[in-house]
Amino acid sequence: MNRYQETFKRLSCLKEGCFIPFVVLGDPSLETSIKIIETLIKSGADALEIGIPFSDPLADGPTVQKSNLRALSKNNTFFEYFKILKQLRKKNKKLPIGILIYANLVYNQGIDNFYFQCFNSGLDSVLIADVPIEESKIFYNIANKYKINPIFICPPDADADFLYKISLYAQGFIYVLSRPGVTGIKNNTIALPRDFINKIKKYNSVPLLQGFGISNPKQIKEAISSGLSGVICGSAIINIIEKYLNQEKKMIKEIKKFTHLLKLSTKLE
């Protein structure tokens, strides 16, 4: 079994959902970013989704866009990013670690070289946010060559044809969107209908995780009670980073408290 399979199996035995925080690597700096990630792990993260900074993150709302720009302003290199990811893996042998990236960055590295670097850094998965399933074959094939799980996004209004396609390609988990649009906290983030969740499960047994707008315990309890395996939370954590940009100790303290609260919410009673 790979790390995702082992993690989901362990959490299922514990009657817990999977909590995956998302942050952008290098925001607000590489040094602080490492402290944030270490805090997330110590405070209960079951896996990590780490964004590689990009200048035009189309799938992301204002909060994550600003996070990308803050990280890019430091002029860090791909070499530095992968060095940190490799260090994270050395310290966390069993933790699933995935990255979210945009296609231009993959092309700039060379597709094969990019996935080799992922493999060499001990990564488990790659989600290319702006590559639809229909255009994913070349990435999918090379990801498999290096034993990297390709992660795909499933919109809440997906039809049967799409669900069938995603069932053919999905590995690790499926990222099910709370709503169409971009990332961010909105008042209209609602629980996914149980019949929609059951429909996806008919096509694929890969765990389903809900993302986009997850920001409080109630949403997490609803997601897991409806049959999902867990949640991904990004903007709510990045809001804390932005709020305390000039108060690192306070930032870390608030992230620790928030992460602990959300992880507790994944436990089925």
Swiss-Prot record:
One of the Pfam families matching this protein, by short name: Trp_syntA
Pathway participation: Amino-acid biosynthesis; L-tryptophan biosynthesis; L-tryptophan from chorismate: step 5/5
Cross-referenced InterPro entries: Aldolase_TIM, RibuloseP-bd_barrel, Trp_synthase_alpha_AS, Trp_synthase_suA
Residue runs in coiled coils: none
EC id: 4.2.1.20
Keywords: Amino-acid biosynthesis, Aromatic amino acid biosynthesis, Lyase, Tryptophan biosynthesis
Top EC category: lyase
PROSITE patterns tied to this protein: TRP_SYNTHASE_ALPHA (PS00167)
Superkingdom to which the source organism belongs: Bacteria
An example Gene Ontology molecular-function term: tryptophan synthase activity
Reactions catalysed: (1S,2R)-1-C-(indol-3-yl)glycerol 3-phosphate + L-serine = D-glyceraldehyde 3-phosphate + L-tryptophan + H2O
Positions annotated as active site in the UniProt record: 49 (proton acceptor), 60 (proton acceptor)
GO cellular component terms, A-Z: cytosol
Function as written in the Swiss-Prot or TrEMBL entry: The alpha subunit is responsible for the aldol cleavage of indoleglycerol phosphate to indole and glyceraldehyde 3-phosphate.
Record family assignment: Belongs to the TrpA family.
Known partners and oligomeric status: Tetramer of two alpha and two beta chains.
Name this polypeptide is given: Tryptophan synthase alpha chain
Organism of this sequence: Buchnera aphidicola subsp. Acyrthosiphon pisum (strain APS)
Upper taxonomic lineage: Bacteria, Pseudomonadati, Pseudomonadota, Gammaproteobacteria, Enterobacterales
